[in-house]
């Protein structure tokens, strides 16, 4: 039988590898509504096709509903500017809904253990653990963690109970494993859309910069001509000087606009 990587008595966190934890397979299996599962997957496919930004939220909602969980979520692994690794909850539902966007450390965490082993985990965390990491949330009495990865991006999808100690079974694992694949696809799609948006914005900025360059050329040429004429002296020199000031103001405004554009992109 597998042993916990961290005992709940000392740390408040208990994580068990499902591939070696035989007791999980002996848990009582709840009856399932196959039609409900099919309808949920159809709804998921529909959201992905018609409203992609909502796919991650739909994923956790379906995970929670099909597994009978109290909370569900998707964690994304991130790197901080200092090179540290952390997890951001990019989708949450149930009792953990208020913690959308929460950032947790990767060291000494169920998600970190899950990704380090690249294997599904059963986990529990007590109030002691949550207090240690500074999170004011209900403890986890039973939880399933499934890793997912696409290219270099990875994370976990999870369902948790806050009261029952043996809520999840092999069928829940099967369902969550399938949904983990959807999570990976959804995250990759989101990244591709963001990249496309950035590229579109960059192209728009380039076009605007080219337009500004042409607009700058006119007052610049006028300024050069006016300065030349003013330098010749004569009765019109004062008028040419005033015109040079006006051209300089126009040129300065366009340059500021161009500089602002560069800062924005």
Where are the model-predicted features located?
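Allosteric cytosolic regulatory segments
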Residues: 177-184
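Short beta-strand-to-loop transition segments that serve as allosteric relay/switch motifs
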Residues: 95, 155-167
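GAF sensory/regulatory domain recognition
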Residues: 61-64, 73-102
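Conserved DHp (HisKA) dimerization/phosphotransfer helix of two-component histidine kinases, i.e.
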Residues: 66, 238-265
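Signal-transmission linkers at sensory-effector interfaces
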Residues: 2-54, 205
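Conserved HAMP-HisKA connector
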Residues: 40, 192-215
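A short, aliphatic-rich beta-strand micro-motif
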Residues: 141-150
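Acidic/proline- and glycine-rich, intrinsically disordered low-complexity segments
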Residues: 85, 95-123, 128-129
């Amino acid at each position: 039988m597998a042993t916990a990587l961290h005992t709940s008595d000392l740390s408040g966190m208990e994580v068990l590898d499902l591939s070696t934890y035989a007791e999980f397979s002996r848990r009582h299996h709840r009856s399932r509504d196959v039609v409900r599962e099919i309808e949920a997957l159809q709804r998921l496919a529909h959201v992905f096709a018609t409203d992609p930004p909502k796919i991650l939220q739909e994923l956790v909602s379906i995970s929670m509903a099909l597994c009978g969980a109290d909370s569900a979520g998707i964690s994304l692994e991130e790197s901080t500017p200092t090179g540290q690794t952390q997890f951001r909850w990019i989708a949450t539902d149930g009792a953990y809904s208020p913690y959308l966007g929460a950032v947790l450390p990767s060291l000494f965490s169920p998600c970190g253990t899950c990704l380090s082993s690249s294997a599904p985990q059963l986990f529990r965390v007590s109030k002691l653990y949550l207090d240690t990491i500074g999170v004011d949330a209900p403890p986890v009495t039973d939880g399933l963690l499934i890793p997912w990865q696409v290219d270099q991006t990875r994370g976990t999808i999870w369902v948790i109970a806050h009261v029952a100690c043996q809520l999840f079974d092999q069928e829940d694992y099967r369902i969550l494993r399938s949904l983990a694949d959807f999570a990976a696809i959804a995250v990759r799609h989101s990244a591709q859309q963001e990249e496309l948006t950035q590229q579109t914005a960059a192209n728009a900025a380039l076009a605007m910069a080219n337009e500004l360059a042409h607009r700058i050329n006119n007052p610049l040429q006028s300024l050069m001509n006016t300065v030349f004429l003013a330098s010749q002296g004569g009765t019109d020199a004062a008028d040419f000087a005033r015109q040079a000031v006006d051209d300089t103001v126009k040129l300065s405004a366009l340059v500021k606009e161009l500089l602002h554009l560069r800062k924005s992109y």
